[in-house]
């Protein structure tokens, strides 16, 4: 009788261990056999989301503090930096952008790359020391630009290289800035102290205006209305007339975007070209 009781206790213990092992195994993402840098999971790789973009197939790409995620409607395809030149340059994603040719660009704190149809990444060679790409932009002519805190790079299709075109665009002691390209292909860099306009054709500085209230965020609406917000309110700069101004109607469009067919700035980071 005593042996039987011990036997049953051992069976119960083994069953409990087996259930625990199965539960732990369920939480381990499945590794694809075809792509070493791809992990399949029911969860996003990291909760700190840095950028979101939709590709031409309607799949949602999410860049996080640790890893790149592609959500296909059922599960997350997670991409990581691996010891391979065909992988991501770094796990810390800063920006994702779909250009006019439906190519998907991924920027990281240590470089930028193009996603390939086979699941690999084509890394762009950078001829500068600062590889922390914070934003990817494109003008109407299809020119691709990469912005860092210190430099502006332009992509050379022939050599797959990012070439420095501008340096020291941001003033000293400025740790917050933003950048937009308007409908006339002028690149506007908003810093804590000024708004600067560069013609994308030759990146010549054509406009520089001081700003107030130390801007912390900006948003380009309709290709020419540059809204700049700071601690003391909001300013409106028209990039067509290059004058400061504002109207209750314009502010109303931001406050109630559904009535005007617009997305709110907090959820519309950039317009993406149609598929």
Regions found by a protein language model. Give the residues of each.
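Carboxylate-rich, polar loop motifs that coordinate divalent cations or form catalytic acidic clusters
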Residues: 2-275
């Amino acid at each position: 009788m005593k042996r039987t009781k011990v036997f049953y206790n051992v069976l119960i213990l083994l069953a409990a261990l087996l259930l625990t092992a199965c539960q732990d195994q369920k939480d381990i993402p499945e590794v694809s056999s075809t792509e070493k840098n791809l992990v399949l999971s029911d969860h996003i790789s990291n909760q700190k989301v840095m950028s979101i973009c939709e590709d031409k197939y309607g799949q949602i790409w999410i860049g996080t503090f640790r890893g790149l995620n592609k959500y296909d409607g059922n599960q997350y395809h997670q991409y990581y930096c691996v010891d391979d030149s065909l992988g991501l340059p770094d796990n810390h994603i800063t920006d994702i952008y779909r250009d006019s040719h439906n190519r998907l660009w991924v920027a990281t704190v240590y470089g930028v790359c193009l996603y390939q149809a086979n699941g690999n990444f084509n890394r762009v060679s950078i001829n500068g020391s600062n590889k922390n790409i914070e934003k990817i932009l494109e003008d109407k002519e299809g020119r691709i630009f990469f912005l860092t805190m210190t430099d502006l790079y332009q992509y050379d299709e022939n050599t797959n290289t990012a070439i420095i075109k501008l340096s020291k665009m941001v003033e000293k002691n400025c740790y917050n800035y933003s950048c937009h390209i308007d409908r006339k292909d002028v690149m506007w860099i908003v810093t804590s102290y000024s708004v600067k306009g560069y013609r994308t054709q030759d990146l010549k500085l054509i406009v520089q205006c001081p700003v107030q209230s130390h801007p912390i965020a900006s948003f380009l609406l309709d290709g020419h209305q540059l809204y700049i917000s700071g601690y003391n309110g909001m300013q409106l700069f028209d990039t067509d007339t290059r004058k400061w101004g504002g109207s209750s109607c314009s502010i109303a469009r931001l406050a109630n975007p559904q009535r005007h067919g617009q997305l709110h700035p907090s959820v519309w980071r950039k317009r993406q070209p149609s598929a």
